[in-house]
Amino acid sequence: MADLLRKVKSIKKKQDQSNHQALILGKYEMGRLLGHGTFAKVYLARNAQSGESVAIKVIDKEKVLKSGLIAHIKREISILRRVRHPNIVQLFEVMATKSKIYFVMEYVKGGELFNKVAKGRLKEEMARKYFQQLISAVSFCHFRGVYHRDLKPENLLLDENGNLKVSDFGLSAVSDQIRQDGLFHTFCGTPAYVAPEVLARKGYDGAKVDIWSCGVILFVLMAGFLPFHDRNVMAMYKKIYRGDFRCPRWFPVEINRLLIRMLETKPERRFTMPDIMETSWFKKGFKHIKFYVEDDHQLCNVADDDEIESIESVSGRSSTVSEPEDFESFDGRRRGGSMPRPASLNAFDLISFSPGFDLSGLFEDDGEGSRFVSGAPVGQIISKLEEIARIVSFTVRKKDCKVSLEGSREGSMKGPLSIAAEIFELTPALVVVEVKKKGGDKMEYDEFCNKELKPKLQNLSSENGQRVSGSRSLPSFLLSDTD
């Protein structure tokens, strides 16, 4: 009897330990294993508070350190922070313990596109839909300076609504890695989907390599088999290098023409993303999407726990994830309570704003942004930004002293224009408002600033032109450009 009681207590203790361990960082309940690799395992998990299903990539920190792959992990985090798009698997947050690194990501329930294609070729309309979503996502990545370099059906997932999601940015590269010749030189990718210039090992354009892979994927969707296939890998490479493929007889003429240009062996003659998106076959039924571009610096989070150590060595920073739901949509509502006080600027902030110690650097022309100093109340500045947004039919999102203006113009591969404004306290009587482009086309941003933003904010100066005591060297309102 005593032995039985001891066994029951032992089992109960193990169950309690298991339940405690299953709640990762006090937030996520770990579920079944979804997949694994050399350094990481991916689990299905559930947010204990919201009930939302997520996928958690658990990376063994010791293995990563021993293999010298810290830079690789940092780059993957940086890339996932850059590419938030409806057709890309989303990174929610990054956390760490002393032994593990956790990527909390969107859980895509439908599985790999590969499994769908393995059953046979797709109908033209279905293939077109997936291809449109793929091009939309990849072109956005290119605009953000990210090149996937390993696009294939196995890395394309389908959600419960049948929408495509690009995943696995582990082999991706960013513009910063381009050498002095303007090209990448790392040999990577999956043999059947790799571009001929990668095989040549002479340097390659990351965008053109992705376009080649997208062409192979389109062929596979329509045909049910690969355009370049041979049991002998070297023989397959020769076919790729020569561009030796034939389209099946059931391919429409428009697809034949598109594939010939996408699978052009000479990169300089290969179609670009705009070329693809301008073809009549691509444009048929293409649904332009609206999405929210987050500030790059708001995507990493390190949980605060006794068992947690900083991921500073991995992510380079720690900050809270800011989801669109945290912002208040533009419908005239305000949160309860008074207007929040802006964050104060200290001497170090001012120096970081300026190229030198001379504060006149605050007001110099130097890039895609603007700052102005104003004596107007915070509420009045925000109201003016809302008024400008109403005039041009932009959506406004607000959180404390941050305002996001989001355009709705569709059709640009760079996404809709998105602008962030943040208010800082300079003195008790003065504030600095920093305005920056978060997403969209630079020419559209410049036009918006010159025609809408600057003139209407200058009007604020005349409405609040009273001089603030002790501010003779700083006008009550001065608009200028900066980084």
Curated annotation (Swiss-Prot):
Stretches the record annotates as Activation loop = 168-197
GO MF terms here are:
ATP binding; protein serine kinase activity; protein serine/threonine kinase activity
Identify the EC number(s). 2.7.11.1
Q: Where is the composition biased (Polar residues)?
A: 313-322
Phosphothreonine: which positions carry it?
T186
Report the superkingdom from the record: Eukaryota
Residues covered by the NAF domain: 340-364
Region (Disordered), start-end ranges: 313-338, 459-483
Q: Which UniProt keywords apply?
A: ATP-binding, Kinase, Manganese, Nucleotide-binding, Phosphoprotein, Serine/threonine-protein kinase, Transferase
- State the top-level EC class: transferase
One GO term (biological process):
signal transduction
Domain text: The activation loop within the kinase domain is the target of phosphorylation/activation by upstream protein kinases. The PPI motif mediates the interaction with the ABI (abscisic acid-insensitive) phosphatases.
Task: Report the protein name in the record.
Answer: CBL-interacting serine/threonine-protein kinase 19
Organism encoding this protein: Arabidopsis thaliana (Mouse-ear cress)
